[in-house]
């Protein structure tokens, strides 16, 4: 085999998987789709297996108020929360007690605790990411509902990677925090390209960003 032939084989060997990934992205990346599919008013949650990520504090409060307004009778629920966030866990458990149903709970280790140095947080961040990756691979929800905390970003991208690899078909629904009136949060900006549905609560945001949905204030 001469040098030119060997070079052609090498280029083809490298380029083929890259091309396959790019084609796959064209099919699954929501930001590359035309927004016609979100012009019609749709139910936020339909009958499915739903995962709900609780981000602690105000994010958990907003999420619980949103959930309380949805018809969840035919929805199988799994709650994802940060390890040690007992307040969020208690709110989810209280909701399930009032609903008279049972559900699953998945704790995700914190990537970084308050006051922890950035250097010492490297191993804990890696551990949190790997734990989340394994947990999501086992769980593979039909729909995951997120609303803004930084914790949701790695979880969403892990699920998107699994979609890219054909391991799941999770629909990612992101609801921007009510506090965001004129500009999306950093989490929102990061998740806008990969979210199947992206919902804002202020018309000013709806006018600024393509692909977003607006149904008024949800909480």
Swiss-Prot record:
Pfam hit, one: Alg14
Membrane topology classification: Single-pass membrane protein
Cytoplasmic side: 30-219
Major localization class: endoplasmic reticulum
Alphabetized GO MF terms: N-acetylglucosaminyldiphosphodolichol N-acetylglucosaminyltransferase activity; protein-membrane adaptor activity
A Gene Ontology BP annotation from the UniProt entry: dolichol-linked oligosaccharide biosynthetic process
Transmembrane segments: 9-29
Subunit structure: Heterodimer with ALG13 to form a functional enzyme.
Protein's organism: Candida albicans (strain SC5314 / ATCC MYA-2876) (Yeast)
The protein, known as: UDP-N-acetylglucosamine transferase subunit ALG14
Compartments where found: Endoplasmic reticulum membrane; Nucleus membrane
Transmembrane recorded as keyword: yes
Lumenal topology ranges: 1-8
Record GO cellular component, one term: UDP-N-acetylglucosamine transferase complex
Family named by the database record: Belongs to the ALG14 family.
Keywords linked to the UniProt accession: Endoplasmic reticulum, Membrane, Nucleus, Transmembrane, Transmembrane helix
Gene name per UniProt: ALG14
Job of this protein: Involved in protein N-glycosylation. Essential for the second step of the dolichol-linked oligosaccharide pathway. Anchors the catalytic subunit ALG13 to the ER.
